[in-house]
Amino acid sequence: MSSTTPSDKDRVVIFDTTLRDGEQCPGATMTFEEKLNIAAMLDGMGVDVIEAGFPIASDGDFEAVNEIAKRTQNAVVCGLSRAGAKDIDRCAEAIRPAKRGRIHTFLSTSPVHMKYKLQMEPQAVFELVVSSVTRARNHTDDVEWSSEDGTRTEFDFLCRCVEAAIKAGATTINIPDTVGYAVPEEYYDLFKRVRETVPNSDKAVFSVHCHNDLGMAVANSMAGIRAGARQIECTINGIGERAGNAALEEVVMAMRVRNDKLPFWNKIDTTQLTHASKVVSAATSFPVQYNKAIVGRNAFAHESGIHQDGMLKNAQTYEIMLPETVGVKQTSLVMGKHSGRHAFIHKLEEMGHKLAGNQVEDAFVRFKALADRKKHIYDEDIEALIDEGMVSAHDRIKLLSLSVIAGTRGPQRATMKLDVDGVTKIEESEGNGPVDAVFNCIKSLVPHEAKLELYQVHAVTEGTDAQAEVSVRLSQDGRSMTARAADPDTLVASAKAYLGALNKLVMKRQRDVAQGAAAAAAS
């Protein structure tokens, strides 16, 4: 159980929902392997509860939750469930292998949701709250109940549902700001009043879950904690539906840096925050904005002359936390073609990467190839290199070579060689620009109906020899996959990113077909 006790009344449970709410962000779909990798990382950095997915949503979600439940050593593994019996039973089956499992069941309670979404009367909703929590409690003694759209729910009805949920066996009560509508003072008052009004409120841990539609997710989360909540639901980088969720790195560091005003503690190893941000960014192919608090590239950068002067005299003049506390290495060490395997492995360990022997060897080979083309290799280059290796290990379609003829006189022409399931294929195509020519080559070599939804380029580091990092999102048949790739040649990076997204679509389709066949055979 992850509930608080009188001896640790100021401890805040960190409930990470990157793999569930975070993945619901359009285009943020992760592969099975990426989910396992992120879950292991979250467990290792001290997250208390990992919401691993929504088991009833798909066979893929069920499989991921089930496997994470088997592998997780320390954290509670949680699955999300609607209030129906089928949902709850499926969720219970998914988390069954966990050392500590939790069922998180939810039901809308606001007038607008009950009328238009559920099309149910309040009394029927109330009865379903009781029956759903009771059913979940029959499977596990760790049950969380959420009042969806809690901040727009009528107060008396909310209190009635909360009291009934606790009486039915809920050990955690979550009152989410589902649509990001609340302001801090309002959210504080809501938690304070609910806890004072509900007679059995001391029998459960209260939880906050805030969305960022008005940019107040972190502020609202802190307000809820000050009012007595002791669990924060959040995501790495703040990813999530619409404008996202409260960012884990921000709520954790707010408690650490301003402990004088927020006298609470948590178990997160903050030195892993920057690495975690990069891992999730790579898996979702969502770049972290440069000025993102805590983990953005500019979070500890100072360009103003006045600021730089102050920093040189005393870092405390313009920095409220040490970069090292969030895992930012303050070093000017760069690597190049003369760097050996030992130095490379040391650098990987310093950056928080734990790779198997064959993965290290593969990464080192690609590092040396990059070093032959680029004078200085920075940490950002190595991060991009590792990211590419992690997602390309099982690719069915691989880029072997690419040459492009471009200039002021068109048309532009690309010649590409691919390995498709072990078969080498070559094609030459023209296009309205070099990128179009490259993508037309891929379409000729691997015919598909996927639609290009996103094409984005930015430089990994500074300088004319900087690697270009390209993000590509493809969608087909209701599936949407995003991939990133980096290379000193923008066109090569573009081809790799497109192929990365295409490989993800192929793998997703294969997994769905296999699961469908297995389900049909079992029925």
Swiss-Prot record:
It is an enzyme of class 2 (transferase). One of its GO terms (biological process) is L-leucine biosynthetic process. It comes from the Bacteria. HAMAP family: LeuA_type1 (MF_01025). Catalyzes the condensation of the acetyl group of acetyl-CoA with 3-methyl-2-oxobutanoate (2-ketoisovalerate) to form 3-carboxy-3-hydroxy-4-methylpentanoate (2-isopropylmalate). It catalyses: 3-methyl-2-oxobutanoate + acetyl-CoA + H2O = (2S)-2-isopropylmalate + CoA + H(+). Mn(2+) binds at residues 21, 209, 211, 245. GO terms for molecular function: 2-isopropylmalate synthase activity; acetyl-CoA C-acetyltransferase activity; manganese ion binding. This is 2-isopropylmalate synthase. Keywords: Amino-acid biosynthesis, Branched-chain amino acid biosynthesis, Cytoplasm, Leucine biosynthesis, Manganese, Metal-binding, Transferase. It is found in: Cytoplasm. The gene is leuA. Belongs to the alpha-IPM synthase/homocitrate synthase family. LeuA type 1 subfamily. Homodimer. Its cofactor is Mn(2+). Residues 398-523 are annotated as: Regulatory domain. GO terms for cellular component: cytosol. Its EC number is 2.3.3.13. Pathway: Amino-acid biosynthesis; L-leucine biosynthesis; L-leucine from 3-methyl-2-oxobutanoate: step 1/4. Residues 12-274 form the Pyruvate carboxyltransferase domain. InterPro entries: 2-IPM_HCS-like (IPR050073), 2-isopropylmalate_synth_dimer (IPR013709), AIPM/Hcit_synth_CS (IPR002034), Aldolase_TIM (IPR013785), LeuA/HCS_post-cat (IPR054691), LeuA_allosteric_dom_sf (IPR036230), LeuA_bact_synth (IPR005671), PYR_CT (IPR000891). Gene3D superfamilies: 1.10.238.260, 3.30.160.270, Aldolase class I.
